[in-house]
Amino acid sequence: MELISRVFTHGENILLVSSTNKLYIMGNNEYGSCGFKIGTDKTYIESPVYIDIKLDDDDSVKAFYSCNLFTMIHTSKGKIYLSRSFICGGGEIDAYDSESDVGSDAESDAESDAESDSENHTQNNTNTPINNITLINLDSSNNSTQSDNESDNESDNESDNESDQSCSDFDCGPRSDNESDEEVFVDRNDNNSDNIGNSNSIDNESESMTEKAGIILLNEIKTMVDEILSQKNINSVGINDIVIRPSGQYVSNMGYITESGSVSFHTNKNGFLLFKSNVHEILFVEEMFMYSKNNFIYLAIPFKKYQASLRDIAPFHTINKTKNGIKWKYFKIVFPFDTEKIEFCDNFFYTYESNTCYHHVISFYKNVNYYPSWIYFKSEIDINSKNMFFSSDTNSVYVKDNNNVYKYHNFNNSLEKYIDNKLDLDVVIVPDSYRPMEMRLLLKLGITLYSDYNFNGCEDDEEHIFEIMKNQYVPHIIGLNYFESFIVVIVNNPNMLTITTDDGKIFFNIHDITFYKRFYNGIVYLDNGSLFYLTDSEISDQNVWKLTGCQLCELADSTIYSYLFNLPDKIDEIYSSSEFIVLKLIGNKYFYYPVENFDTAQDFKTRCGEISLKNNSVLELVNTSIINRQSKSYHTTVSINIDTDCTTHNSFERLFILTQSLSYSAEYSIRIVDDKNIGFGDGPKIEFCESAIMQFYYKYLIAHNFHTEFNLQEFAKLKPTEIKYLGSMFHMVICQNNSSLPIRLPLAFAVEIYGKEPTIDELEYFACNEDETGFKHIYPAKYNPELVKEFGYESYEHCLKTLCKYNYEDDTDKNILTKKYCEQLAAGFKRYGNIKNIKQMNLPTLDYYISGPYKINRTILINNLVLSGGKDKNNNYLEMFKEFINSLSENELKILLKNWTASTCVRPDNKYRIIIISKSKNAKAGIRFGTCNLEIHIDEKMLDEHNIDTVKEVLITPAQGFKD
């Protein structure tokens, strides 16, 4: 069975890695950030969903990021997977329409991608101020050699074997990373775009690509620019047009951006796609990210953030990266020098240019929102990635040299001594406990604590150091946590208790603490194997959260509480994000807790609960969102009259004749005459078709549990043309009724339509549905060939095929006949009409399209119940029918649905109505079914306690006659 092997958390989402390296996701999907729609009224995924990514055996998840707009996964082999919401703007993600991609099969045969830029762009942007920023042309003749060398060098370094794959929830089988889709660059501003080559991958900067550089020229940096340009032999055209920044005005230093490509390939619009390969490091902040690859830095911004994030960046050139018609953009930061080495340092990228002795820091600064920032400065002190720290709040860099501290000031673009440590201060630079992108400077002198951050609420001045407190525990302080009504001071002291109160503050000693994490209004920590939550909030419903609380202490402005998590077993590991903690208990059990605010959190309906992977992907492989059975447009409507007194032909024979007689562009309606009763509409039509299909089922198929095989003796009596018409009949019933067939055709038939052999995952899906007990028995032998042979099978795959009744026998003649009949049926099935979105389906989804679910979805049926009438007891009646539906066996529920709707399929867009009729005492009581309107009419006097058992018996007895 699938077991959880690793857990990653970020924001409001959880990523799970299974024992077979499959990836599952759960959490916030409000804006489709997980890559797919799960229903208009459901914004959270409350149990793990397989996202159709299975990593290679030698690959693993390195990092996981999520935000409101998209989700990203970075692997140890350098692959970045992005949810498609990144390029869909967080809007509605539509199911893929395969009919609009005629000829796209050829595109998927090989990967190709060329990146270029039009000469028009080069000419139009030369030395043209954009937003009052002077651009320096690096495409002048003096720079041609350098540009070619850079292009060649990158082309050599970046391999052409990167594959972009479409990954979606439920809708396609796992593909190997070697599979790829063709990518063709189209520069919409280039009239000769049709002639662009297609030999490069996304990341290859081809020679045809024009690099453009933009530098924001600030006060006192003209010398630096001159040095850079002279080193690169660049003609400093426009260098005198220096933009002088008004004193005190904030300006981002980001300024050297070039477009990195434009691609188009065939993929579906749901789920995840492989964005890049061979990526070294990622810097993620809120709703954008940078990544390093082959000593270059790239910037990626989701669709909805383009304008807001790039308004201060120049030059800004539109690029059209198109995946299945959706545009998106990413950018390359091109330095005006050869970068020797780019390092990743927690919250920034760093590179040093030895020729000019300039240090360069690339990160994000926060000014209401986050924006890209490029900081550069010259310094003679020894600086490296280990003694440099970046603050996003002030867009500043700290450098710690011994106990002296230097700080880069954005207002004068220089590195200056910030702390002249003549007093031998103990200087500590730590990430902010709540905002890891922000650094805090703590200085300790005896029992006095200072900081450059104004914790006390006075007017901030970045040039001053503030005294924070005087306390005996100051020498042991390693962090501060300021909450709305109390302060938690983090200390590390072997001689202190875990929690000590002093001077109106809480001192939290982590010396013996194995885990602690600050959340919105408290701290969760692990102490001696028990998990506690320290907060000033009194939790009203502790039982829901499985907590036991007590009042810990009184402070001047608040009361502090401590809550113990009541867990069924000891904690093995803890994973956390800003919104969640996930606990791994002994025995490989996992529990999640949304902890931003225990008292008001409504993120998950269950609030806290156990996480487990659904066994064997039984519920994970079918993607119902891309199923569309109404794929035909009918030009005419033909009315068919059927009299039940005429017994010359049964329903199957009538439907078979009808299939041969009607044009495939004609819609038919059924009018059934049964003695004096006349029925017409969708209900009688569905009932007639299902009756016909069932008659075919009993004659031409051999039934097992769910799966079937052909009755070869009966099929041998049919001509090839007749078998093709049978296939057309099946698809006609599906499309005309907008419903699946009431039977399950042999798996070989679905495989023939699908055009590919089933994967092991897909075979497991079918085998488990056919015989769950037998499947659980053989699953442990999946990776044990010897054990499989002891069970009497050649291989694990052979065992699965036997359970599925698919191509499993040694009888070659039987397999050949089955294959032939499937080909003929599939030809007729396709001839009637195309299957919408078939290219996005995996085999279980196609099987669902044809035959529907294996089991009736009671949850949808109950949620879509609508009861009217009997107003005084309406709620009581509704609850009674819900309990009744839940109590039925699968066969009884099928009979009820057949009576109610003329079909055994439950559709999420249907409303199932129960109408309570009030009549006089003298009126005859009864139950009537209205299949067209999906209604059951029940006389209220039948619902008293004396008749209720009779009502239930009638509901699950096949109905005679109809009301339509």
From Swiss-Prot:
<feature type="compositionally biased region" description="Acidic residues">
    <location>
        <begin position="149"/>
        <end position="163"/>
    </location>
</feature>
<feature type="compositionally biased region" description="Acidic residues">
    <location>
        <begin position="97"/>
        <end position="117"/>
    </location>
</feature>
<dbReference type="Pfam" id="PF00632">
    <property type="entry name" value="HECT"/>
</dbReference>
<dbReference type="InterPro" id="IPR035983">
    <property type="entry name" value="Hect_E3_ubiquitin_ligase"/>
</dbReference>
<feature type="compositionally biased region" description="Low complexity">
    <location>
        <begin position="121"/>
        <end position="148"/>
    </location>
</feature>
<dbReference type="InterPro" id="IPR000569">
    <property type="entry name" value="HECT_dom"/>
</dbReference>
<protein>
    <recommendedName>
        <fullName>Uncharacterized protein R349</fullName>
    </recommendedName>
</protein>
<feature type="compositionally biased region" description="Low complexity">
    <location>
        <begin position="192"/>
        <end position="203"/>
    </location>
</feature>
<feature type="region of interest" description="Disordered">
    <location>
        <begin position="97"/>
        <end position="208"/>
    </location>
</feature>
<dbReference type="GO" id="GO:0004842">
    <property type="term" value="F:ubiquitin-protein transferase activity"/>
</dbReference>
<dbReference type="InterPro" id="IPR009091">
    <property type="entry name" value="RCC1/BLIP-II"/>
</dbReference>
